[in-house]
Amino acid sequence: MRKLVIQVPCYNEEATLGGTLSALPREVPGIDVVEWLIIDDGSTDKTVEVAKAHGVDHVVHLPRN
């Protein structure tokens, strides 16, 4: 099985993350699974909530930037 994980580092991206995620593919020819990984660098806004609302597969939360 071929899997692609798209990683997006974020810091206080509540206002822009939705548009970014909407532009990411969920299907890629020749790839069986596409997953999204958000790396939250200690955001103090609702970055993680926005990510989850857009169906992100994985969130890694770093406590500080």
Feature names for model-found ranges:
Residues 2-3, 23, 58-63:
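Non-transmembrane catalytic domains and loops of membrane-associated enzymes and transporters
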Residues 3-5, 35:
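Cell-envelope/extracellular polymer assembly enzymes that use nucleotide-activated donors
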